[in-house]
């Protein structure tokens, strides 16, 4: 998911079949590996469902119609249309919903809350997906070799740690294999499913939704609860939307209906047919569906598929972190570009090591894919519900859909998502607390950072000197001017930056050209070069420059300044000096945030990556001035 620009460019030039194969490799890894554990979890997950004819057909019917309603209908028909200038993902959707609700501040705040909580849960999902996927693939070895039970966890850890260790080197070289491997995976899923269905074609009756309704009637006490296991078939549905900016809506939709959906349904029905004929196979219906001679090759293919699924989720966490940083919800971090050809391939070390630590703890703590499955559904359904709420706002307030048409539809979508989420709430006390706690911690961090930055800006602005008054004083009492251009980064456009005042106080000089630079991040993913720069001259050698970036643009300030069209402004490297202000926060009893949040914000600010690296400023042309601010 980190290959934003490369895929975005490919979307316009690649042949449809090549783009479809690439989409299968990146988008469908997570949902494509769900057959490894979904049906097993339904009957072995402690829900009390007996392996009977009616129960098997009922569960298959629920899986079938869940995939049709949630993925084929909700995501394909509606969510994928809610693109933010071609970009998808919950952060892009939150920016879109925030724009749609701009005239309603309270509603806008709610959209931000849902967007941030959905994003926070996605990070929890980014830890669970690699753990449960690789564990479920490795568990096939228990069937192939006796006495390997105790080696499953160590082998899974070796694979997962290796996966995280190679992230800094990028995946461009091996990434070309993802598509062909996943296409092979889905073809094998379909073939195994057909093989199983041929043994007991009766399972095809489950296409009739009456079997699903009948399941609820027969199992009134666990009917809704079983949706907590059925939802495992939908894990990865959010990736369809998140990766839309990489491939476009049409290739993702075509891949789903042509290959992925048929393969998944055939495999689930094949597993159901196997269990229908031999209830003992419910202990691992996916692997037992394969002929004995095919078991080891299938384990190898499963391991590759789960690694690809894990890679997509890890890359997705990098991409979403970049969006969140540029929207102002996460402190700036060092971002490493892992490919000279594809600008969008990135690596963020802090995120990588945090995810690796979380994955290791999950594998050691839960030890099996079955135990981990209980933690999985909470993150998935929570993110899906947040997405539906955000899309609802976009449909009603941005697209202006007629309420008579939109409201009943949205009620149905929210009802289904609400049922899935409610079914997973009890799991919070059975292992599902991990993604909720991780999400809550990340939500607190993001909201603390955003609020802290707002308060910091307010404190700095207090008593600030208005720019017109400062320039007037320069005219009356001109200071000594030195050659070159001084660029002062500032968040405000109407006041004198503290760094400029400090420079005047200590050095008693001004440069010939003084540029007050403000960087603005828009709610759109990209800003065209023609709209990148705003320039205004104040006279006396003072200029106001505003640079506009999208939330996936690379903020290269020197390159953007080169786009200025005023001939008198000279930004040549050896004549330009950048002045930065570095604030140190001192928590106090002043109004604002709770003391513990102020202390947390101060810690985050101290450890955040500075403007120098983030804006790609030349190291030897930067002067940083510190200031202390009470909050």
Swiss-Prot record:
Pfam families: K_trans (PF02705), K_trans_C (PF22776). It catalyses: K(+)(in) + H(+)(in) = K(+)(out) + H(+)(out). Coiled coil: none annotated. It is a multi-pass membrane protein. It is found in: Cell inner membrane. GO terms for cellular component: plasma membrane. Keywords: Cell inner membrane, Cell membrane, Ion transport, Membrane, Potassium, Potassium transport, Symport, Transmembrane, Transmembrane helix, Transport. Belongs to the HAK/KUP transporter (TC 2.A.72) family. Transport of potassium into the cell. Likely operates as a K(+):H(+) symporter. This is Probable potassium transport system protein Kup. It comes from Pseudomonas savastanoi pv. phaseolicola (strain 1448A / Race 6) (Pseudomonas syringae pv. phaseolicola (strain 1448A / Race 6)). The gene is kup.
């Amino acid at each position: 998911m980190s290959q934003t620009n490369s895929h975005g460019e490919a979307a316009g030039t690649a042949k449809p079949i090549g783009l479809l194969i690439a989409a299968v490799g990146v988008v469908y890894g997570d949902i494509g590996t769900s057959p490894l554990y979904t049906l097993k979890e339904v009957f072995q997950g402690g829900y009390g469902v007996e392996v009977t004819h009616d129960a098997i057909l009922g569960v298959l019917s629920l899986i079938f119609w869940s995939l049709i309603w949630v993925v084929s209908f909700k995501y394909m028909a509606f969510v994928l249309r809610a693109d933010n200038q071609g970009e998808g993902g919950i952060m892009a959707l939150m920016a879109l919903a925030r724009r749609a609700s701009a005239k309603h501040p309270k509603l806008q705040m709610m959209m931000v809350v849902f967007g941030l909580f959905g994003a926070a849960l996605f990070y929890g999902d980014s830890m669970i997906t690699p753990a449960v996927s690789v564990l479920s693939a490795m568990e096939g070895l228990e069937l192939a070799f006796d006495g390997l039970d105790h080696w499953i966890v160590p082998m899974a850890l070796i694979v997962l740690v290796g996966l995280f260790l190679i992230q800094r080197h990028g995946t461009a070289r091996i990434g070309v294999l993802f598509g062909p491997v996943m296409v092979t995976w889905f073809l094998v899923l379909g073939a195994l499913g057909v093989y199983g269905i041929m043994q007991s074609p009766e399972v095809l009756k489950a296409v009739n939704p009456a079997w699903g309704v009948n399941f609820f009637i027969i199992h009134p006490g666990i009917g809704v609860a079983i949706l907590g296991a059925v939802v495992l078939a939908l894990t990865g549905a959010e990736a369809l939307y998140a990766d839309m900016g990489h491939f476009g809506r049409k290739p993702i939709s075509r891949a789903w209906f042509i290959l992925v959906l048929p393969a998944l349904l055939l495999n689930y029905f094949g597993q159901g047919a196997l269990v229908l004929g031999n209830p003992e196979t419910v202990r691992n219906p996916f692997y037992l569906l394969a002929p004995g001679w095919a078991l080891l090759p299938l384990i190898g293919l499963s391991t590759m598929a789960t690694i690809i699924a894990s890679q997509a989720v890890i890359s997705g966490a990098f991409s979403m972190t970049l969006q969140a940083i540029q929207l102002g919800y996460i402190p700036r971090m060092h971002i490493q570009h892992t490919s000279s050809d594809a600008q969008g391939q990135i690596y963020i070390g802090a995120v990588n090591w945090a995810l690796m630590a979380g994955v290791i703890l999950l594998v050691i703590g839960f030890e099996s894919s079955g135990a981990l499955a209980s933690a999985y559904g909470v993150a998935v359904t929570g993110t899906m519900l947040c997405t539906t709420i955000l899309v609802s706002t976009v449909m009603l307030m941005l697209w202006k859909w007629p309420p008579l048409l939109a409201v009943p539809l949205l009620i149905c979508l929210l009802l289904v998502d609400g049922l899935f989420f409610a079914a997973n709430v009890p799991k919070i006390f059975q292992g599902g607390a991990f993604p909720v706690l991780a999400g809550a911690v990340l939500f607190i961090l993001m909201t603390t950072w955003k609020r802290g930055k707002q308060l910091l800006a307010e404190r700095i602005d207090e008593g600030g000197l208005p720019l017109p008054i400062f320039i007037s004083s320069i005219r009356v009492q001109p200071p000594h001017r030195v050659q070159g251009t001084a660029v002062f980064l500032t968040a405000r456009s109407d006041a004198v930056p503290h760094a400029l005042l400090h420079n005047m106080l200590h050095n008693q000089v001004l440069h010939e050209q003084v540029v007050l630079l403000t960087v603005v991040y828009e709610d759109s993913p990209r800003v065209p070069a023609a709209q990148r720069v705003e320039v205004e001259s104040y006279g006396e050698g003072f200029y106001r420059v505003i640079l506009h970036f999208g939330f996936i643009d690379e903020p290269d300030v020197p390159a953007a300044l080169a786009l200025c069209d005023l001939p008198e402004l000279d930004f040549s490297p050896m004549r330009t000096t950048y002045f930065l202000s570095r604030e140190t926060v001192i928590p106090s009893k002043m109004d604002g945030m709770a003391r513990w949040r102020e202390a947390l914000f101060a810690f985050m600010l101290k450890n955040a990556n500075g403007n120098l690296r983030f804006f790609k400023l030349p190291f030897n042309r930067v002067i940083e001035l510190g200031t202390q601010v009470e909050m």
